[in-house]
């Protein structure tokens, strides 16, 4: 974990408290305090909503978008592994964070398939005793700590097999409005718990790519839900556009060229503090997107 001289104040987010309060106040605008837990599941949200809302158009659009992301994930993973097999170390390192962005944008659906998520994306720090480590981060460690592609052969083949399995399962995913709203919140929690701290890409320090991808994933959900949010709370749309804009402007300061980002080690404590504060300010209005479920 990278050393930081400030304490993050980002709290994990949830949408249940916001929806419960809204249901209790049918004709009164209610100011809701920031949430403090991300443990809410879809059933809790559904139980708090007063009536079912037709989200079929939105869920179909989101599922189709995630499919395009996983299509690209598979294509880039195959290119990445081909580079590993060819011993092209620097080219593999360059493609590694870009390939991962497709997965990071899609996590609300990608992580719903049992142990596929950890097989593809597990960090060394999250391994259980005697658990076999596979996936992107196992390869990352070899590339950046040993500075070689040797030893990645078996891991590369397994990674392609796992990504192919994920690709095949996306059409079977059950996508609901609950999953979309909570998924956007969970993506922000991902940023606040591992990307901001530099723990996600601890060997390559390519955390800003993951950070950007998580924000893009949450912003895509917002874009799809925007017409429904606009109909119920136009001010919330304006606030979310401003808050997403603020985060993206800060990330743009650390962009290199059209597609790359600085090493996370190059960021100062002031840089990471500014990013943390911008993410924190986005958190509560993002959770309020749950109004579309009412």
Question: Model regions: which residues?
Answer:
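Long, low-complexity, intrinsically disordered regions
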Residues: 31-42
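Bacterial N-terminal signal peptides that target proteins for export
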Residues: 1-11
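Bacterial signal peptide processing site
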Residues: 23-26
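Mature extracytoplasmic or organellar-lumen-exposed domains after removal of signal/transit peptides
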Residues: 40-294
């Amino acid at each position: 974990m990278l050393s930081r001289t400030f304490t993050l104040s980002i709290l994990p987010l949830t949408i249940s408290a916001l929806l419960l309060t809204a249901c209790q106040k049918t004709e009164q605008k209610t100011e809701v305090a920031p949430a403090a837990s991300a443990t809410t599941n879809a059933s809790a949200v559904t139980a708090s909503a007063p009536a079912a809302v037709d989200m079929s158009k939105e869920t179909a659009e989101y599922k189709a978008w995630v499919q395009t992301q996983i299509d690209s994930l598979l294509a880039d993973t195959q290119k990445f592994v081909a580079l590993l097999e060819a011993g092209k170390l620097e080219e593999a390192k360059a493609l590694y964070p870009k390939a991962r962005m497709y997965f990071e944008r899609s996590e609300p659906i990608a992580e719903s398939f049992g142990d596929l998520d950890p097989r593809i994306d597990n960090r060394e720090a999250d391994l259980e005793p005697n658990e076999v480590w596979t996936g992107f981060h196992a390869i990352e460690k070899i590339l950046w700590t040993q500075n070689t592609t040797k030893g990645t052969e078996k891991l590369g083949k397994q990674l392609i097999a796992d990504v192919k399995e994920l690709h095949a399962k996306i059409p079977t995913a059950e996508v609901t409005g609950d999953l979309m709203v909570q998924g956007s919140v969970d993506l922000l929690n991902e940023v606040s718990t591992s990307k901001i701290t530099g723990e996600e890409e601890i060997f390559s320090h390519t955390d800003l790519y993951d950070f950007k991808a998580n924000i893009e994933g949450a912003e895509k959900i917002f874009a799809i839900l925007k017409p429904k949010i606009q109909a119920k709370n136009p001010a919330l749309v304006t606030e979310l556009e401003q808050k997403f804009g603020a985060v993206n402007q800060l990330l743009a300061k650390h962009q290199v060229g059209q597609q790359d980002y600085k090493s996370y080690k190059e960021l100062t404590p002031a840089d990471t503090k500014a990013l943390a504060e911008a993410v924190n300010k986005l958190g509560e209005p993002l959770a309020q997107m749950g109004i579309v479920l009412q």
